[in-house]
Regions:
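Short S/T/G/P-rich N-terminal loop/turn motif that feeds into the first structured element of a domain
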Residues: 1-70, 90-99
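Conserved short beta-strand edge segments in small beta-sheet-based binding/regulatory domains
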Residues: 77-95
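Short, compact, well-ordered microdomains
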Residues: 65-67, 72-76, 80-83
Length: 99
């Protein structure tokens, strides 16, 4: 079964930049994708009003997701995302789905 992680951000206006993953995080996503642990990912799905952004990562299993989430780089990125969003009045949510 696949495991999907959604990261959704809502910004107050278009003058505020969304938080985006670093080059290093994208490289880590690519490593997991090359190994088959990530089936696909999209990083920049933007709503028509330009105020909402969705990141979607499809893992091949819950175990692969759990492994990914223990990576120091990913933990640090999650901390940076939380800080950035708080400083810039961006609300965000994490949603998971098992399919």
């Amino acid at each position: 079964m696949s495991y999907i992680r959604y990261i959704k951000q809502t910004r107050p206006n278009t003058a505020v930049a969304f938080f985006s993953p670093s080059v290093e995080v994208i490289a880590k996503l690519d490593v997991y994708k090359a190994s088959g642990k990530i089936e696909s990912y999209t990083l920049d799905t933007i709503s028509t009003n330009q105020l909402n952004k969705e990141i979607k990562i499809v893992f091949n299993s819950l175990d692969s997701f759990d492994e990914f989430m223990t990576e120091e780089l990913i933990i640090a990125s999650a901390t940076k995302r939380g800080e950035y969003c708080a400083e810039n009045f961006i609300s965000y949510s994490l949603e998971d789905d098992l399919i």
